Amino acid sequence: MSALTPASEVILRHSDEFIARHVLFAGDLQDALPAQFDAAGIRVHTNQYHHWQLLSNTLDENVQFGLVATPETVAACDTLVYYWPKSKQEAQFQLANLLSLLPVGCDVFVVGENRSGVRSAEEMLSGFAQLTKIDSARRCGLYHGRLDKQPEFDADAWWESYQVGDVIVKTLPGVFSRDALDSGSHLLLSTFSEPFKGSVLDVGCGAGVLACVLAQQSPKIKWTLSDVSAAAIEASRATLAANNIEAQVIASNVYSDIKGRFEMIISNPPFHDGIQTSLTAAEMLIRGATAHLHVGGKLRIVANSFLPYPALLDAAFGSHEVLAQNGRFKVYQATVGRPPRDPKKKR
């Protein structure tokens, strides 16, 4: 994330516009542009924990991580620079939140790659700000307007739910598998045929559906759920509460905030960061797993069949097995073995 994204490079083409402004950066911001940006004031709101980690080292308390921005975050800001995300519903949710807090008359800049659907920003905001496209470069569009009217925003109105068997799943915009259980997670769940117990870590927990389904089958599991997404963290907590299941839910960039070791780590790891393909999280998951598993502990993940995870698993664990597969997905499992005995040590 050290290099600038195409969207940030487009913003830099207009850097003179921002020198005297108090700028709020938000949305799918994936680089450190705010930390090196020349403006009268800089604030950042992000719902991605790993983006907060990157920026907080430089911007300290001027970076907020959370599901929604607060009045304190946007205080004194007269300009919004919003990075368009992959999910249109997530954009609607975030912009409704941000524009409900910003003052009428503030400048609104929306930037994003064309393939992300940023063109729909004009229509989406037509009732609140008249956007005009002011630049097109690096396969991105940059739009500008002024806030004419603050939208109303109620975060509670954005919750949705569905069921997986007897499990109630609570979801929010931007959460993976928001409308139904995805086929990869379904295949992963199918590999758990017998009840088990112990401590289990779900990395990239989404709405918490894996833990809640497995908790019905194996109620003695001690669960820890983690994700980088603030929306996923809140959705997991709501799903757990709806099903009367206790678990620890924390924000963590893979293992960054994970303490202790587990009997099992499960995951349906992402291979995108926003709209960009990225195997970073999955590579960190696999390479760091042995440091967070007991001897005999298992890493069980589901992934698209074409992704290069077998070699990573073999490098980290020495071997792996395929528990299930279909036309698109495979479920891999690798086990932590006992380290070889040092022949120089006495028994």
UniProtKB/Swiss-Prot annotation:
It is found in: Cytoplasm. GO terms for cellular component: cytoplasm. It catalyses: guanosine(1207) in 16S rRNA + S-adenosyl-L-methionine = N(2)-methylguanosine(1207) in 16S rRNA + S-adenosyl-L-homocysteine + H(+). GO terms for molecular function: 16S rRNA (guanine(1207)-N(2))-methyltransferase activity; nucleic acid binding. CDD domains: AdoMet_MTases (cd02440). Transmembrane segments: none annotated. Monomer. Belongs to the methyltransferase superfamily. RsmC family. HAMAP family: 16SrRNA_methyltr_C (MF_01862). Specifically methylates the guanine in position 1207 of 16S rRNA in the 30S particle. This is Ribosomal RNA small subunit methyltransferase C. It comes from Yersinia enterocolitica serotype O:8 / biotype 1B (strain NCTC 13174 / 8081).
